[in-house]
Amino acid sequence: IYDLPADSLRATRGFLAVTGTLAKDRVTVIVCHWPSRGAGSYYRELAAKQVKAIKDSILHHDAERKVIVMGDMNDDPTNRSMHDVLLAKGEIEEVGTDGMYNPWYNVLVKEQTGTLRFRGAWNLFDQIVLTPNLVAQPSNKSRKGLHYLNHEVFRRDYLLQTEGKWEGYPKRTTAGGVWINGYSDHLPVVVYLTTK
């Protein structure tokens, strides 16, 4: 990801866009791993801008296509990159035609939990956001085809530290160069889709 020629030396990971058919609907999934927090918010906001441009271009050519953006955004749902640039909103009623629905916003804000912990506080960098045509608006309960049903942070005991200083944190594979037989420092997120 870079914006200016001078930035090309600092180019970061790109995006993977996969298009296909899921439950008879045309779907594109854009997988991301946005720049780290050490790089500053500018590059994550630039990533959000580029992902939004990709999503908008796809929908310009096929307005019925359902688009899912997912990955480690290295930002919370409340951060500018997600909320103001990608326009991923936490309330279905707030989602405009060019925006996306972010079910993780309220998980972080209201439930005060997330997918990783840093200095005792939860962050929710791992997100799956959806275009409006995947989400039934409260004013329109009729749903056609594939649509959003529910979501969860996949929190299971075997994924968490059960004792010591890091109790309750995601159980990493290694810590301080020592193998601790864990899975990841991030918990997975799941979005459930249905056709019913």
Features from the language model and the residues they span:
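Active-site-proximal beta-strand/loop segments in catalytic clefts of secreted hydrolases
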Residues: 1, 30-35, 70-74, 131-133, ...
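Structured beta-strand-rich core segments of catalytic domains in phosphoester-bond hydrolases
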Residues: 1-26, 34-35
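Second-shell loop/turn segments in exported
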Residues: 5-6, 34-44, 69-70, 113-118, ...
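Solvent-exposed, acidic/flexible segments
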Residues: 8-11, 40-48, 118-122, 184
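Conserved hydrophobic/aromatic beta-strand scaffold that supports enzyme active sites
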Residues: 15-19, 31, 127-128, 188-190
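Residue-level recognition of the N-termini of beta-strands and the immediately preceding loop/turn
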Residues: 27, 64-67
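A long, amphipathic alpha-helix that forms part
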Residues: 41-63
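Metal-dependent phosphoester-hydrolase catalytic domains
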Residues: 57-65, 75-196
